[in-house]
Swiss-Prot record:
Transmembrane segments: none annotated. Interacts with PPP1CA, PPP1CB and PPP1CC/PPP1G. Residues 1-63 are annotated as: Disordered. Belongs to the SDS22 family. One of its GO terms (cellular component) is chromosome. It comes from Rattus norvegicus (Rat). This is Protein phosphatase 1 regulatory subunit 7. It is found in: Nucleus.
Amino acid sequence: MAAERGAGQQQSQEMMEVDRRVESEESGDEEGKKHGGGIVADLSQQSLKDGVERGAEDPEEEHELAVDMETISLDRDAEDVDLNHYRIGKIEGFEVLKKVKSLCLRQNLIKCIENLDELQSLRELDLYDNQIKKIENLEALTELEVLDISFNLLRNIEGIDKLTQLKKLFLVNNKINKIENISTLQQLQMLELGSNRIRAIENIDTLTNLESLFLGKNKITKLQNLDALSNLTVLSMQSNRLTKIEGLQNLVNLRELYLSHNGIEVIEGLENNNKLTMLDIASNRIKKIENISHLTELQEFWMNDNLLESWSDLDELKGARSLETVYLERNPLQKDPQYRRKVMLALPSVRQIDATFVRF
């Protein structure tokens, strides 16, 4: 994300995307874990240090001396500006950036979103890991496509209804308790609200272009109000309070479903989700593999940490000819001394059992 175009911009975009996969991991998205690869784990590690939630930091950090923007030299012709971890305390002096398209201000000491009205060419704004309590003063940025205000102190989703070109919105690890004020964001393709205090899926009926929805690590008790999201391909609901798989009948394009760390007892409600390639139901209370024989495109099936006892249940997966990875560890059937051999015999296409690759 250097001030120059070309290779610098490409590297910038790759770094920010990988960072966001780390964010997705925080919301319980195993896809983020698979692809994140730890490339930039150190960037988010500062926020996760000792498991301290934002808003309860060391008081001394609150009084860290901010840098005066006058001491920072800005390239007036830059299209990509990266001021990551500069100890900036106030957004000011950026009006000279007439050509800027991507502005990264992550890991600073910013408390208020302000003085950005002149940056009307801005497409991407990254405010990850600051001290922002309110989304405000963004109305002029009507061309914005990517907005990241993760790891801040937000309590409400507000002040973004004019950002109608927004395609990706990241509000991970805040204190948000309700999904609201996003009905005008009809171009949105990715919505990441993991690690908040949300109790219900609501107010997303107009987001018909949404492809990825991440709501892991919240307090949601029911899968509902998803009918309009027929273009959804990824749904992450890990670490919530779900007890039943339901409300997915219209998600006919769903390819990845993450439901681990809930209170689900029965595999059901997936009759119309024939395109699933990834199903994660680990760490629930499920005793039986059932109702998924029609999921013939499955490539990964994660059901570790459940109550599975019967080997015959694996027959339910035999139609998935492309199945390569299964996680079944910490189920009662793993106690069988022939555990790995029996999995291999039942599912000959599998190349990875739990964390270990199959040897031939």
